[in-house]
């Protein structure tokens, strides 16, 4: 994928500053356009990545019971307003035939999918679909909780509100006991 055009972003930020009545040449703002461009390069770094590659290496451990990585901190940018949202992801899967992934790979997939203009609902679904496709588990359950700045600093102005999304696949979809186990473990500190 082609690199992010930082100069084009910096030029656009300068235009925005002028449009809101600011002087982009004043002391506090003179370097802001390029700072924003470098920030966008970082927060949109997932655009240049294929998150599914994290499951290219699978281990045969003969573990066929629940695996849960919880409280994976993430941040993303709302594609509607280009303001951040952030929170935690909880990712569970039920291995099939003992096929397991390195635990850090679950967090890496969440990061790569999050680091692009995005919707929380899409992150949740995409992580679950990648895991089902590449890891081939009996089931996957992804729950994400996030605070959205588009609800906190504008519009409805409701700081502290959380949005919770879930994607439930395979065995978790049809087994209430298994789903309840994941939810109980997420609540457990």
From Swiss-Prot:
Binding site for Zn(2+): 78, 81, 150
InterPro entries on file: GTP-CH-I_C/QueF, GTP-CH-I_N, GTP_CycHdrlase_I, GTP_CycHdrlase_I_CS, GTP_CycHdrlase_I_dom
Enzyme class: hydrolase
GO cellular component terms listed in the entry, alphabetical order: cytoplasm
Catalytic activity: GTP + H2O = 7,8-dihydroneopterin 3'-triphosphate + formate + H(+)
UniProt record, GO biological process: one-carbon metabolic process; tetrahydrobiopterin biosynthetic process; tetrahydrofolate biosynthetic process
Record-listed E.C. numbers: 3.5.4.16
Pathway the protein acts in: Cofactor biosynthesis; 7,8-dihydroneopterin triphosphate biosynthesis; 7,8-dihydroneopterin triphosphate from GTP: step 1/1
Keyword Flavoprotein (UniProt): no
Alphabetical UniProt keywords: GTP-binding, Hydrolase, Metal-binding, Nucleotide-binding, One-carbon metabolism, Zinc
GO molecular function annotations of the record: GTP binding; GTP cyclohydrolase I activity; zinc ion binding
Domain of life, per lineage: Bacteria
The keyword GTP-binding appears for this protein: yes
Complexes and interactors: Toroid-shaped homodecamer, composed of two pentamers of five dimers.
Family from the record: Belongs to the GTP cyclohydrolase I family.
Protein's UniProt name: GTP cyclohydrolase 1
């Amino acid at each position: 994928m082609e690199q992010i055009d930082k100069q084009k972003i910096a030029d656009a930020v300068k235009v925005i500053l002028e449009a809101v009545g600011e002087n982009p040449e004043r002391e506090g703002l003179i370097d802001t356009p390029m700072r924003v461009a470098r920030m966008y390069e970082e927060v949109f770094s997932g655009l240049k990545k294929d998150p599914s590659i994290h499951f290219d290496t699978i281990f045969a451990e003969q573990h066929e019971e629940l695996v849960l990585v919880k409280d994976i901190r993430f941040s993303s940018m709302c594609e509607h307003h280009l303001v951040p949202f952030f929170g935690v992801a909880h990712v569970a899967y039920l291995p099939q035939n003992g096929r397991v992934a390195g635990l850090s790979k679950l967090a890496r997939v969440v990061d790569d999918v999050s680091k692009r203009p995005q919707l929380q609902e899409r992150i949740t679904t995409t992580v679950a679909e990648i895991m089902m496709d590449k890891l081939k588990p009996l089931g996957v359950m992804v729950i994400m909780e996030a605070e959205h700045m588009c609800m906190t600093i504008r519009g409805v102005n409701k700081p502290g509100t959380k949005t919770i999304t879930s994607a439930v696949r395979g065995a978790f979809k049809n087994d209430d006991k298994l789903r309840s186990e994941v939810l109980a473990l997420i609540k457990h500190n």
